[in-house]
Amino acid sequence: MPCLSRELSARNGVMDQSLMQQTVIVVPARLASARFPSKLLAKVSGTPLILWTAMRIAREAPEFPLWFAVDSEEIGDVLEKAGFSIILTSSDLSSGTDRIAAANETIGAKRLINVQADEPLVTRSQILALTEAIEKPEADMSTLATPIVSSDDFKDSNVVKVVRDANGFAMYFSRAPIPYPRDDLEMLEKKTLPLLRHLGIYGYTAEFLRAFTILPQGDLEKVEKLEQLRALEHGYRIAVGLTDDSSIGVDTPEDLARVAPMLLAADKGVG
């Protein structure tokens, strides 16, 4: 079971050093935000959110080169003053994937890990699981999933579900409940189904990134509003790694208030 052993090695924080030398972490950082204007500059204990994310990544995965693909000098200045590397990209780019592709024209990495700028609690095991998954020979892209433990989450359209094939590759992503237990709805409560919640962090090969930026949107992406479906619709393969670590993003001021105590506790633990 080589796939399982690779997933377990990533969870345990062990990885081939040669993979690290060819892989970089790039964080797309966009100033505008519909639900929380300038959220990356919002402060927790005097420190902007983007710096909490930057410090977390640097602490959790110091082996990897770390870049920030920014669309504003304001965010760039904050990061540079703290000693982080930035690449200024166009504010007209439509997605984080496009922003990373633009940044890689300068970086020139073979594989890239996309950590969201508004997820300041990303873990080492998540980063390593993404890196292990993108190393699969058939993988064009990688992402993560974690078990769904609540029937409410399974039914929630804001919780994106993913179904994997026997080799750990994505079959489909949906906001709908999948796979749906037609004959026994109690299976939801019994937790006997392999229900997986998609976590929106990704790994890419450089070749895939170059191709993805010129692919047209497909009908599935337009209907579900899920960018990763563009890759599946055009025949690309997405390796889905497993992690026990859930993802906590900041989309609203309320999210930031909820995350703030966790950030401070984690920072105190390191100190």
Kindly give the residue locations of the regions a language model identified:
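Short, high-confidence coil segments that cap the C-terminus of an alpha-helix
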Residues: 63, 109, 138-140, 236
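A conserved hydrophobic position in a structured secondary element of the catalytic/binding core
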Residues: 70-71, 122, 204, 251
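Short phosphate-binding loop-to-helix
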Residues: 67, 73-132
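Hydrophobic/aromatic residues located in beta-strands of well-ordered beta-sheets
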Residues: 25, 66-68, 112, 142, ...
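N-terminal glycine-rich phosphate-binding loop and ensuing alpha1 helix
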Residues: 19-70
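Conserved core of the sugar-phosphate nucleotidyltransferase
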Residues: 123-215
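Conserved alpha/beta core of the MobA/IspD/sugar-nucleotide pyrophosphorylase nucleotidyltransferase superfamily
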Residues: 189-271
